């Protein structure tokens, strides 16, 4: 099967104003908007100055309140609403904030934030003494955030340790070099991350998290059921509408070019098969619980979108007969350091992988 639809290249990199990095800035702008709400769900005092420092004009104006989410929306396209997206990110941020605080109340003092972007939890949450927070992301992202927060006079509320690594590669080695202790229970998060990874990279990441965790470790992420064809079409249409609205404000960001569609192992099932005890809540229910209207049915191409928190019970891998390995993709090389819209990212299923029943060992954890 040939799959084309992303301009992502194997090993591509970014800063906070381009490609995947720009989505981190967009999410930080949403957190700034949520912080300014009349009855805020969250308080991220660093979101607005971080967005301002990145320098994307429309996101700075949204973060500062000069523009509102409704200013961005097209009234004739209510299904592609920046207002609803801002509500979603407020609820999501609160979910992960509470996940980490619950983990520390259970005695966990080691935290790993995967793809931390402009996440400022190491500075704004009330971590107990002796808590170590590891943040992993691309070098340009981590350098920018660390420098900007230092210039703001911000001080971490935990022992913050920066890990610069690509989550598609051997990040466990870099994490270990920063002092990570695999004998201690850990609270992990993969917030807004997995759909930006190719299917095999997602599985490797979850395998690595499991291999580096002892029982009673915790993990939080989102789990999305695989797209049905008509759902994918509607999601792509919504992303295109939002991209056109962003372009009207001088911001060129099209999520269609950044996320990976196509079948993959569903994270919740994958974690359960590998010894994690799951607690799930639908996005719709979490919106309602926090005082927002749920999406109307016709708005939602992904009704099976869950927030997942998990606790590791057993430390061994399973390969149930009902679970197929993720497709193995051969990556067609893109031009080096180029994200040209004319250069599609093509992936071809490996026939050899279809006959495989055992996943390869995680990178960085081989003997």
UniProtKB/Swiss-Prot annotation:
**Single GO molecular function:** methyltransferase activity
Q: Which cysteine pairs make disulfide bonds?
A: none
TM spans, by residue? none
Q: What is the annotated signal peptide range for this record?
A: none
| Keyword Transferase set for record | yes
Q: Biological process GO terms, please?
A: methylation
SUPFAM superfamilies xref list? S-adenosyl-L-methionine-dependent methyltransferases
The entry's S-adenosyl-L-methionine-binding residues are 137, 166-167
UniProt keyword annotation of S-adenosyl-L-methionine present: yes
- What ranges does the record list as Polar residues composition bias? 348-358
| Region called Disordered, residue ranges | 348-367
Role summary: Exhibits S-adenosyl-L-methionine-dependent methyltransferase activity.
Q: Which PANTHER family match?
A: S-ADENOSYL-L-METHIONINE-DEPENDENT METHYLTRANSFERASE YKTD-RELATED, S-ADENOSYL-L-METHIONINE-DEPENDENT METHYLTRANSFERASES SUPERFAMILY PROTEIN
Designated name of the protein: Putative S-adenosyl-L-methionine-dependent methyltransferase MRA_0734
What is the species listed in this Swiss-Prot or TrEMBL entry? Mycobacterium tuberculosis (strain ATCC 25177 / H37Ra)
